[in-house]
Curated annotation (Swiss-Prot):
Sequence-specific transcription factor which is part of a developmental regulatory system that provides cells with specific positional identities on the anterior-posterior axis. SUPFAM superfamilies: Homeodomain-like. Belongs to the Antp homeobox family. Deformed subfamily. Residues 150-209 bind DNA. Its main location: nucleus. A motif (Antp-type hexapeptide) lies at residues 129-134. PROSITE patterns: ANTENNAPEDIA, HOMEOBOX_1, HOMEOBOX_2. Residues 110-122, 230-245 have a biased composition (Low complexity). Residues 215-227 have a biased composition (Polar residues). This is Homeobox protein Hox-B4.
Length: 245
């Protein structure tokens, strides 16, 4: 019914559309000239140059020896490629030698420091060996000594040492361990030397005063004979009560 009314009614105006050429994009988007794109490229190159500036500064700090004051600076293209000046092209054609960064030399080793020290410092650091710390009864040090019991030699006391020992013996014929250590330190002798000297001095003192030697034991047969009762005394005791009877 609707279609028939549409076809019958001839007063209906048919809509008309503009041609397709009028709907081109040029009406809505402006046409840009080639200068517009060239300006954009220039802006992008400026941004790249700003980004590469700190890296160029770092290269100047790391390799100061590779730069020369007489040469011109390299030109940076918009693409980021470096174009050297015309004067440097002949030099760049030759084989380039790697530039080594300037690094500080390493400090000398401890062995070199020890060798450079003066002999006076080394002598001061040597440990002090006192006479009482050395081995007793060894006259000379043999470098070819391979071991075994060293040969003992007689100790030669000085006059001052003998005088001090005689003074001590006059007051005390027997020394304590503490006093023996004190005398050994004061006279630069060992405890064994002090002990042997006092033993010999006591033997000499007993001999001068005719005292018996306490170290020599008496004969057991003589002591037992002295304890036995003589036979004459035993006979007199047995005959006494018989005569009274």
């Amino acid at each position: 019914m609707a279609m028939s009314s549409f076809l019958i009614n001839s007063n209906y105006v048919d809509p008309k559309f503009p041609p397709c050429e009028e709907y081109s994009h040029s009406d809505y988007l402006p046409n840009h000239s080639p200068e517009y794109y060239s300006s954009q490229r220039r802006e992008s190159t400026f941004q790249h140059e700003a980004m590469y500036q700190p890296r160029s500064a770092c290269s100047e700090q790391l390799y100061p020896s590779c730069q020369s004051s007489g040469h011109q600076a390299a030109v940076l293209s918009p693409r980021g490629h470096v174009h050297p000046p015309a004067g440097l092209q002949s030099h760049l054609s030759e084989p380039n030698h790697p530039c080594e960064p300037g690094t500080p030399s390493p400090p000398p080793s401890c062995s070199q420091n020890s060798l450079n020290q003066s002999p006076s410092n080394s002598s001061c650091k040597e440990p002090v060996v006192y006479p009482w710390m050395k081995k007793v009864h060894v006259s000379t040090v043999n470098p070819n000594y391979s071991g075994g019991e060293p040969k003992r030699s007689r100790t030669a006391y000085t006059r001052q040492q003998v005088l001090e020992l005689e003074k001590e013996f006059h007051y005390n014929r027997y020394l304590t361990r503490r006093r023996r250590v004190e005398i050994a330190h004061s006279l630069c002798l060992s405890e064994r030397q002090i002990k042997i000297w006092f033993q010999n001095r006591r033997m000499k003192w007993k001999k001068d005063h005719k005292l018996p030697n306490t170290k020599i034991r008496s004969n057991p047969s003589s002591s037992s004979a002295s304890l036995q009762i003589p036979p004459a005394a035993s006979q007199s005791r047995s005959s006494g009560p018989a005569s009274s009877l």
